[in-house]
């Protein structure tokens, strides 16, 4: 009897330790109810502020949060609610890439997001974290993220600029800017300066190929590198099909 009781207590203790360990290394199990509560509220705020840019639509916001969720698994110390809020609200102010105040958009989005969150009784102690994560997510703003939450959001947003979806977003955005697909005679810019404002294909080498090296987390870098190969392979194939040899 004593032996059975001892074994039962040991099993219960082991289960408790496993549960504690899981809680430590998987923060979503502790915060899931809070995230579930806030996700529809954040979606409502984000949807109300969306424009007509399909490269920065609600699907983009969902993908950024999905990417961030993957990175959060590697960073249990991060505040998942701060990351979720910044993931969904980072584009509340979204100026075109050729707009003269594009570099200010993330600061404007951060200020608007914090005002709206405060009105929704979002935890006040988390607002500064959300503000910083939104301000520093932008490539155009060129602001360094100083918190793990901001690093995760920046990586998550930039990962969506890579891979097959990133490629589609690239050409969609280029069309909105009236850019040509590629330079007629030199698509790979072998004998000319890169110009991604004039030629969509140039954007891969000008910016996107550099993103993996700028990732803030190891997990983000690994995801970015795996997706970059899709763009570089496309660029090579595109150039082969695009360049037409002069008739003999």
What residue spans do the PLM features occupy?
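His-Asp-centered metal-binding catalytic motifs of divalent-metal-dependent phosphohydrolases/nucleases
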Residues: 80-99, 105, 109, 130-138
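An active-site-proximal "capping" alpha-helix that borders the catalytic cofactor pocket
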Residues: 64, 105-117
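Aromatic (phenylalanine/tyrosine) cluster motif
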Residues: 25-28
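Divalent metal-dependent phosphate-bond-processing catalytic cores, especially two-metal-ion Mg2+/Mn2+ enzymes
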Residues: 32-33, 49-76, 89, 142-248
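Polybasic, lysine-rich low-complexity intrinsically disordered segments
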Residues: 4-5
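Hydrophobic, well-structured mid-protein blocks that either form specific transmembrane helices
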Residues: 116-149
């Amino acid at each position: 009897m004593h032996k059975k009781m001892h074994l039962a207590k040991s099993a219960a203790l082991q289960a408790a330790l496993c549960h504690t360990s899981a809680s430590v290394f998987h923060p979503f199990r502790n915060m899931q109810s809070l995230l579930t509560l806030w996700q529809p509220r954040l979606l409502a705020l984000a949807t109300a502020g969306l424009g007509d840019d399909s490269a920065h639509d609600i699907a983009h916001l969902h993908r950024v949060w999905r990417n961030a969720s993957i990175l959060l698994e590697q960073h249990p110390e991060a505040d998942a609610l701060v990351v979720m809020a910044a993931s969904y609200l980072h584009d509340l102010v979204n100026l075109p890439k050729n707009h003269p105040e594009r570099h200010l958009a993330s600061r404007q989005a951060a200020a608007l997001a914090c005002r709206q969150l405060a009105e929704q009784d979002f935890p006040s102690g988390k607002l500064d974290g959300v503000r910083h994560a939104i301000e520093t997510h932008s490539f155009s703003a060129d602001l360094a993220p100083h918190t793990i939450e901001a690093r995760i959001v920046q990586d998550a947003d930039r990962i969506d600029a890579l891979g097959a979806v990133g490629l589609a977003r690239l050409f969609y955005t280029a069309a909105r800017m009236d850019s040509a697909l590629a330079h007629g005679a030199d698509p790979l810019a072998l004998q000319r300066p890169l110009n991604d404002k004039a030629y969509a294909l140039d954007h891969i080498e000008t910016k996107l190929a550099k993103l993996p090296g700028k990732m803030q987390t190891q997990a983000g870098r690994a995801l970015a590198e795996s997706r970059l190969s899709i763009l570089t392979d496309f660029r090579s194939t595109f150039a082969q099909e695009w360049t037409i040899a002069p008739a003999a």
